[in-house]
Amino acid sequence: MEYDKMIADLYPGDQIEGYYILKTAQAKVTANGKPYLNAALSDCTGVIEAKCWDYSGPIGTADEGKVIKIRGTVSEFRGTPQLTIERLRMADESDSYDLSRLVPVAPIDLQEAFESVEQMVESIEDEYYRNVCTELLRRKGEALRSIPAAKSMHHSFLGGLLMHTHNMLRTADFLSDLYSVTVDRSLLLAGTLLHDLSKVEEFTLSALGLVTDYTVKGQLLGHLVLGACEVAEIAREQGMPEDKSVLLQHMLLSHHGQPEFGAAVIPQCAESELLSLIDLIDSRMEIYQEAMDETPVGTFSKRIFAIDKRIYHHP
């Protein structure tokens, strides 16, 4: 029996006991009518799918994002490690574990990234766009430094939203220079900074700071609408010309590209088109990186829901 072994180091045949984060949990029933828990456990090194057969206990979806203590055996299912849980319980105040082992954090210097974001905002030449960005960064900067960018899709670790935003700003800055005849750099950088910033109000966070669910506002409105409304409000307060306010709102409302991907409207100017593509590039590359981290070199990953395919981790 091995204790508190990191998920990245697990291999078929390992018998383990320790503390992990219950990333997802769903009560299910087999074809024979027997109950079981379908779950995923995580630590700072990765995620492993897990099953607890013949389980009809209290642990379920409401416990996602919390720390759980388990005992189990690692096997292999369709070429991917899977954990069969033999014993489990939620951790409580009497338990002793190292949180730094469990909570995944963005693999960047967050302070350095935040300072770079601030410098990008200061470089926005249009004073109206710059002032809106400065105000929203003042309101939400602390949250931006820490919250994930998503529950599970991409950048779902502490500091993930900052990493995603910083990556996108760097890309937007480069592309605004490449396409300087076509693109308004100030509008593109402002839209890039603000496109996901209302996820601060959209998400419910666990005590560990990970996304567990959506707030009522997040569920009913979503971060696109929340962000556009906030931009409109600040724009009025600051006396921004209406045409500029509408363009900046459009950037936020259209950045998912197409209605089937959650866009309120489709991109209808060069800057909004570019923003939706930059967002897609960065989120897609993070999905690939996370899959490669969990997939041995020379093999294919498990099917990835977000992109509906497996990827090959080449040497």
Question: What residue ranges belong to the model's regions?
Answer:
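OB-fold nucleic-acid-binding modules
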Residues: 1-16
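Divalent metal-coordination and catalytic microenvironments
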Residues: 20, 65, 168, 279
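OB-fold single-stranded nucleic acid-binding module
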Residues: 25-35, 46-100
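Short, acidic/hydrophobic/Gly-rich beta-strand patch recurrent on exposed beta strands
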Residues: 38-43, 205
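Acidic/His-rich, divalent-metal-binding segments that scaffold phosphate/diphosphate chemistry
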Residues: 95-218, 258
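Divalent metal-dependent catalytic cores for phosphoryl transfer on phosphate-bearing substrates
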Residues: 153, 163, 174-294
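N-terminal intrinsically disordered, cationic/polar leader segments
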Residues: 276, 293-294, 298-315
